[in-house]
UniProtKB/Swiss-Prot annotation:
Gene Ontology molecular function, alphabetical: tRNA (guanine(37)-N1)-methyltransferase activity
Protein name, per record: tRNA (guanine-N(1)-)-methyltransferase
GO terms under cellular component: cytosol
Reported function: Specifically methylates guanosine-37 in various tRNAs.
Main EC class the enzyme belongs to: transferase
SUPFAM superfamilies: alpha/beta knot
CDD domains per UniProt: TrmD-like
Gene: trmD
GO BP of this protein: tRNA N1-guanine methylation
Protein keywords: Cytoplasm, Methyltransferase, S-adenosyl-L-methionine, Transferase, tRNA processing
Location(s) in or outside the cell: Cytoplasm
Native organism: Mycoplasma pneumoniae (strain ATCC 29342 / M129 / Subtype 1) (Mycoplasmoides pneumoniae)
Entry-linked InterPro entries: Alpha/beta_knot_MTases, tRNA_m1G_MeTrfase_C_sf, tRNA_m1G_MeTrfase_TrmD, tRNA_m1G_MTases_N, tRNA_MeTrfase_TRMD/TRM10
Sequence similarity: Belongs to the RNA methyltransferase TrmD family.
Amino acid sequence: MKITVLTLFEQVVWPYLNASIMAQAQKAKLVEFEVINWRQYCKDKHQTVDDMAYGGGGGMVLKAEPILKALKACRTPQSKVVLLSPEGQQFSQPMAQALTQTEHLILICGHYEGFDYRLYKHVDQIISLGDFVLSGGELVALSVIDATVRLIKGVINDQSLIHESFNNYLLDFPAYTRPYDLDGDKVPEILLSGDHKKIEAYRKEQQLLRTAQYRPDLYKQYLAKKDEKNK
């Protein structure tokens, strides 16, 4: 899989991609990263990336022309182009799973007031992290990349993926490590019992309880999915 990030701030993107799991995935040749500063495609001598909005209003609007030129330089018939913007569909685990099937993913990071709307005609999907505004799309791009790359086969242990939060619409079960007694707060005895069936049942129960408590929206989806399977 190849992932290309179009950004004005490549110095923000590369450190994350060259660390931890992302670096391991690159080293294992499971993913290839490319970061393009689309400022280089500006045609004026000042390399102007934004301009005032037609019709007035506050803030500067990112010019579509240099971004389209950057797209033309890196896009192939196998590419999926994703614009990162607050009005996009909220990113989720199923979306990350779907993106793993993409041969070439291109992520466009915005900044300032937003994009010239004519750019929207040239993208395949619009993604956001949620109902809030960030200064730029780089954090969104890195979140999408991390969530997607770690699902690529061979990047991390398959068993770890099975028990992660959001699989089957449930949060992960609570985890504990040493010491056993932390200022009187002890690890649940069942986890020390050695009875794997009881431990598995306990963890499933905790998943249900935690999801209902912390993410009732997910819990409703879990129940709906369960009812659907039982029909």
